[in-house]
Regions:
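N-terminus-centered regions that define maturation/targeting leaders and the start
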Residues: 2-6, 12-178
Length: 178
């Protein structure tokens, strides 16, 4: 069974384009995880503190409803409204499924930050060009197995591997305009 999952993940990674631009269509997954934040309300404006106009620290996130059998969690923060295609702001893999939150500005022990669209293994706060508000998706994925990702994996490759292995997800959306 594990070899089959590895094959599915490999196929997803191979089929995905590299780089931080457009991503393919998302896999249809059950939305059983609830993601919230004390930093901003669902659908609300993300305070400047968490953006390139402020301290650019990651916001606090909390979640519930992680399915039984989850081995690890992965977090992806992206902007589907970016002019050049979806921009990936943050990828965090190997989150302990027993954990129920990320503190503001924190990455817990054992978790791994992967490259964002700027090529940095770090949180990159919202920083849209002037104009209408962009939507920032904070998506948490439940994974039944540990997904091994190369430290130098392109964001699209890492996300494809996570989405292919995931059994469920949850999403919080915030907005920001400059």
């Amino acid at each position: 069974m594990r070899w089959l999952l590895a094959l599915v993940v490999l196929a997803g990674v191979t089929a995905c384009s590299s780089g931080g631009g457009s991503r393919g269509p998302e896999r249809d997954l059950p939305e059983t995880i609830t993601v919230t934040s004390s930093s901003f309300p669902a659908g609300g404006s993300i305070p400047a503190r968490f953006t390139c106009d402020g301290q650019e620290v990651s916001p606090q996130l909390a979640w519930s409803g992680v399915p039984a059998g989850t081995t690890e969690l992965a977090l992806v923060v992206d902007d589907p409204d970016a002019p050049g295609g979806t921009y990936v702001h943050w990828v965090v893999a190997h989150l302990d499924p027993g954990r129920r939150e990320l503190a503001e500005g924190a990455v817990p022990p054992g978790a791994t930050q992967l490259a964002n669209s700027a090529g940095e293994a770090a949180y990159a706060g919202p920083c849209p060009p002037g104009g209408p508000a962009h939507h920032y998706r904070f998506t948490l994925y439940a994974l039944p197995v540990r997904v091994e990702l190369a430290a130098d994996a392109e964001p699209a490759e890492a996300i494809a591997a996570v989405e292919q292995a995931a059994t469920a997800r949850g999403r919080l959306i915030g907005t920001f305009a400059r």
